[in-house]
A protein has these predicted regions:
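N-terminal intrinsically disordered/low-complexity leader segments
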Residues: 1-13, 205-212
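Residues in soluble alpha-helical coiled-coils and helical-bundle/repeat scaffolds
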Residues: 5, 55-59, 81-85, 121, ...
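Helix-turn-helix
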Residues: 17, 21-63
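Short coil/turn segments at alpha/beta junctions that flank glycine-rich nucleotide-binding fingerprints
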Residues: 28-32, 83, 151
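Hydrophobic alpha-helical connector segments
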Residues: 63, 74-110, 162-166, 190, ...
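Short, basic, alpha-helical segments at the C-terminal edge of helix-turn-helix-like DNA-binding modules
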Residues: 66-72
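Amphipathic alpha-helical segments used for helix-helix packing
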Residues: 89, 104-128
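Hydrophobic/aromatic-rich alpha-helical bundle segments in the mid-to-C-terminal region
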Residues: 125-131, 135, 149-197, 201-212
Length: 212
């Protein structure tokens, strides 16, 4: 079994294929209904090979959630770093959270989040991932605010409190966006989030993304 993964590069590629497959199945069926056999079939692998890489179903699924979040942040970092102003960077971050048409947007991620929250009270491994993701979100927002304050773009608000408030607001839009609530679509969620952010931080937001 040791040789089935092939070279180190092939092993990494195969592992990522399985993680992608796991994410697709979780989005389609939900975390509780995702089985190793489903993931193996989607990845074009045997169940034994999936077990070789991940040992257990829970480990496979928690690693898939972690992999999804890491990939999202890689895209977010690249897009944010390409923008010069802190206000523009914060707008890009919120757009990626709310607008699924954005590259790396969170449409499928929201469905994963619904499962993440549902499983957290009953699964310590999932709860630990949720906590780390929450901390990462807040730290990203906090850093953007502090950088903007140093540049004179943002008002002198408490960056930690703002990060908690904005992340909670974005979390609040998860359910209606994920469930396609006609009263709170992605563009509306983006607009309301940016109204809150610009009002608290004292910068102008023209809402151009919401109308694109």
């Amino acid at each position: 079994m040791k040789e089935q993964a092939g070279s180190a590069g092939m092993a990494v590629q195969r592992r990522e294929q399985m993680l992608h497959a796991a994410l697709e199945v979780i989005v389609e069926r939900g975390y509780p209904e995702t089985r190793i056999t489903d993931v193996a079939e989607r990845a074009g692998a045997s169940p034994a090979l999936v077990i070789y890489y991940f040992k257990t179903r829970d480990h496979l699924l928690t690693e898939a959630l972690r992999y999804s979040e890491d990939g999202w942040y890689e895209t977010a970092t690249r897009r944010i770093e390409a923008i010069e102003t802190s206000a523009g960077q914060l707008e890009e971050f919120v757009a990626m959270m709310c607008l699924p048409e954005q590259e790396g947007g969170a449409e499928d991620s929201w469905l994963l989040w619904l499962d993440l929250w549902a499983q957290s009270p009953h699964n310590p491994a999932v709860a630990a991932i949720r906590q780390k993701i929450d901390e990462r979100w807040r730290e990203t927002i906090r850093t953007l605010v502090l950088t903007g304050q140093e540049a004179g773009e943002f008002a002198a608000v408490d960056a930690d409190d703002f990060a908690v408030a904005l992340s909670a607001l974005l979390y609040g839009f998860v359910v209606p966006i994920a469930l396609d609530d006609p009263a709170v679509g992605p563009a509306h969620a983006f607009e309301l989030s940016m109204q809150f952010a610009s009002g608290r931080l004292g910068f102008s937001c023209n809402g151009r993304r919401a109308s694109n």
